[in-house]
Amino acid sequence: MELGLRWVFLVAILEGVQCEVQLVESGGGLVKPGGSLRLSCAASGFTFSSYSMNWVRQAPGKGLEWVSSISSSSSYIYYADSVKGRFTISRDNAKNSLYLQMNSLRAEDTAVYYCAR
């Protein structure tokens, strides 16, 4: 009976454990047209190296727009036509980090940028 209670208690503890996914973006700022910025996203709470990752953005007063995607191993990379040739997505699985290098910035690139799993 005592052993059974221990197992019930252990299961109850494990069921209460939750893994919180966190994605924290940094690197934004003000730049003139034609300038560059590099965004970073620090990931935690999940096995980063197992997931494709994305950058999306939301311009003032508009909906979300997909910007770019990268596969878990960086083998497959995709860009929206609006940023192709100007933006470069990359990742460092050892650092659980996602990046977006943005060059030749335009006024229409003004937005809040989010990384997404």
From Swiss-Prot:
<dbReference type="GO" id="GO:0005886">
    <property type="term" value="C:plasma membrane"/>
</dbReference>
<feature type="region of interest" description="Complementarity-determining-1">
    <location>
        <begin position="45"/>
        <end position="52"/>
    </location>
</feature>
<dbReference type="GO" id="GO:0003823">
    <property type="term" value="F:antigen binding"/>
</dbReference>
<keyword id="KW-0964">Secreted</keyword>
<feature type="region of interest" description="Complementarity-determining-3">
    <location>
        <begin position="116"/>
        <end position="117"/>
    </location>
</feature>
<feature type="signal peptide">
    <location>
        <begin position="1"/>
        <end position="19"/>
    </location>
</feature>
<dbReference type="InterPro" id="IPR013783">
    <property type="entry name" value="Ig-like_fold"/>
</dbReference>
<keyword id="KW-0732">Signal</keyword>
<keyword id="KW-1280">Immunoglobulin</keyword>
<feature type="region of interest" description="Framework-1">
    <location>
        <begin position="20"/>
        <end position="44"/>
    </location>
</feature>
<dbReference type="InterPro" id="IPR050199">
    <property type="entry name" value="IgHV"/>
</dbReference>
<dbReference type="InterPro" id="IPR013106">
    <property type="entry name" value="Ig_V-set"/>
</dbReference>
<feature type="region of interest" description="Framework-3">
    <location>
        <begin position="78"/>
        <end position="115"/>
    </location>
</feature>
<feature type="disulfide bond">
    <location>
        <begin position="41"/>
        <end position="115"/>
    </location>
</feature>
<keyword id="KW-1003">Cell membrane</keyword>
<keyword id="KW-0393">Immunoglobulin domain</keyword>
<dbReference type="Pfam" id="PF07686">
    <property type="entry name" value="V-set"/>
</dbReference>
<protein>
    <recommendedName>
        <fullName>Immunoglobulin heavy variable 3-21</fullName>
    </recommendedName>
</protein>
<dbReference type="InterPro" id="IPR036179">
    <property type="entry name" value="Ig-like_dom_sf"/>
</dbReference>
<feature type="region of interest" description="Complementarity-determining-2">
    <location>
        <begin position="70"/>
        <end position="77"/>
    </location>
</feature>
<keyword id="KW-1015">Disulfide bond</keyword>
<feature type="region of interest" description="Framework-2">
    <location>
        <begin position="53"/>
        <end position="69"/>
    </location>
</feature>
<dbReference type="GO" id="GO:0016064">
    <property type="term" value="P:immunoglobulin mediated immune response"/>
</dbReference>
<keyword id="KW-1064">Adaptive immunity</keyword>
<dbReference type="InterPro" id="IPR007110">
    <property type="entry name" value="Ig-like_dom"/>
</dbReference>
<keyword id="KW-0391">Immunity</keyword>
<comment type="function">
    <text>V region of the variable domain of immunoglobulin heavy chains that participates in the antigen recognition. Immunoglobulins, also known as antibodies, are membrane-bound or secreted glycoproteins produced by B lymphocytes. In the recognition phase of humoral immunity, the membrane-bound immunoglobulins serve as receptors which, upon binding of a specific antigen, trigger the clonal expansion and differentiation of B lymphocytes into immunoglobulins-secreting plasma cells.</text>
</comment>
<comment type="subunit">
    <text>Immunoglobulins are composed of two identical heavy chains and two identical light chains; disulfide-linked.</text>
</comment>
<keyword id="KW-0472">Membrane</keyword>
<dbReference type="GO" id="GO:0019814">
    <property type="term" value="C:immunoglobulin complex"/>
</dbReference>
<feature type="domain" description="Ig-like">
    <location>
        <begin position="20"/>
        <end position="117"/>
    </location>
</feature>
<dbReference type="GO" id="GO:0005576">
    <property type="term" value="C:extracellular region"/>
</dbReference>
